[in-house]
């Protein structure tokens, strides 16, 4: 016989004895054997054993000792082996019990509100009945549901339990994909859980937990820290874990891009801790209250599980091991409380408790502080490419966020200058809806009953954005009414920096008479560029556009910046040369063409071996007008049934290249019950650069692919705010995307599941569509279509001080209106690297407006802001509008403030304009 394992466990009895596990090999399984354990020559354990593994209790020691384990087989000689016994920690095991509901997944959305109320009411009752019961509300949406039905007494009880730290609130709106939010929405989405929850229930949340998501945008660190959030929780995602697996600590300081802010992040292994779920819930997934049992078998298995888990993380500095154990749509019960009580009856340590995150995360911070490792980088949320399953809805959502910026700004100026009504509740409700749209559960694949899931996905997703856009368009019609032909018009800019851009509109909308214009083949109208000095407007006489694009028979065109050659035989662009550098930008050796539709599909949903189909070309034309050259391509892809239309616009006097892409009749997306990601559409942009380095825009700043990444999950796609860029040696290319924010960079790499990013080709692929959830969305020919608007910029040098400004001008194009509340230049910012993301009225102070900015180039910057009124006071504020220090040196309508690199800066400005 031999001893095959010696494990010192964390379990300490009330007699101060430490439990150890011993496993033996080559036992005859017929006769007992004798075991004696000696420490410093003293016998501390002696028994006869009839098992291949057993536990033994030995004294606890304050310093390392050598334990000699002596095994004497039946009628044989002893076998001795020495093991090191170390002082054992007094472990704490806080168990996190949380609500969890995927919006639109588990119940009809109209019924879910009341279910949330019922579940939270039950949790309140258990907190009152049991002193040690603790519970977390996973997000504000759940609290809002409770608030809709609760009595005044129930609300008072909840407020009391918040104060007693028996119930916690995660400050998130819901389980949102943070990368889908605009820069302003990322902050405004926290107003609900911070501002409104504090006003109603007196709680100031310290944690933001994504209880069913594998990551969050790097920008949440800076944004949330400036709202008072100190702790973030995410969840491991077993389906798309990165390969090779990496040793990322489960607890670390997550530092922002600026290096000045950080939050403490806990990466939960799962929300029903793997291994424990099979022990505690061995006969039922969820036990109704009063039916859970914790017998000797469960006790022994629990002891073994925690012994193994702690042995995996030792040696370490910690003695606190938080464990998540909650489930989808679970009515609160005392199951975890029973586990804690039974374990604590038997064992002095570890100490098992039910605890809320703001308490145990605070304990970890206080106890270990600077010894906790610090990591920097983005953490991919590996379901964020769900955006591709409903491209038309995603396009509408992104349209709403752009409109919100413009309309909220114009409404604020109108309310200050003209004392007009300000629709604060409308803006609040729209942001609430957009956060609902971003909620992570899109009823993945087709679940039963399909009728319910289709109903929910239309309510939670489609209807939220359609109703938001409808409200915003009504407000825009009031603020920016349309003019009749020949009337004076205003050309409005909502960007506080000077700019020179063309107007991009629709046929039938007026354009300035003195500007050259052109109706493009797809019906859009463009003008030559016009210059504006900041937020403001200029007046001009308006006319209906009438100058059509004329088809030309050429295979070579030239603008001020580019030389473009086409092949009419192969119906494609074959050369794109930058005149300044003389460099060719199209990779002629690439598999796909510039702007080409690519149908990528797999036989199995996780198969990394993709097959590719490209369209047959049916038409190719080249047009010219006063402003630009336009190239149109049409094609038909047989396998998917997609009819594809493409339009490139090369402006004669601008570097920007506009691209309109669309497909329709893609009925191949219909079908494939339950399969994920088998059918995918991309548009290819195979560019040619030396030693390419890829960059993706974040809410505040950017990430360099392959460097700024914490590899907790696979790095196969990128979700941008608005642009991606690839720098070469001395030049580069950027793509602005209006409708779809998901890209594959370097290559199409679906199901590769690799954490590494190593690409030597400057190829960019817009991930346009996927058939996941197809039985819920792609159910008719009408649904199987989408449109995408992109802009391409070829630049010399690096992207840093060029692309962010260019992208922002694309995102907030010039507005044409019959009249404008703006007169001349009314607001101007003197630095180009500071992007205004919001101008709004204060939520609480009727005599204040709030401006929020993000820095885009990684530079600490002092800014001068010229306002449209004379302020009486200005302060820096948290991102939830709580005043911080005062800004000094106000002069007339000028404010000077400081902005940190890649950071949010919020200022609140007071004036004599109370409504």
Put a short name on every predicted segment.
Residues 1-102, 110, 900, 911-915:
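Mature N-terminal, pre-catalytic/accessory segment of carbohydrate-active enzymes
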Residues 78-116, 125-126, 133, 173, ...:
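An acidic-aromatic substrate-binding cleft motif
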Residues 187-220, 226, 305-323:
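CE4/NodB-like, metal-dependent polysaccharide N-deacetylase domain
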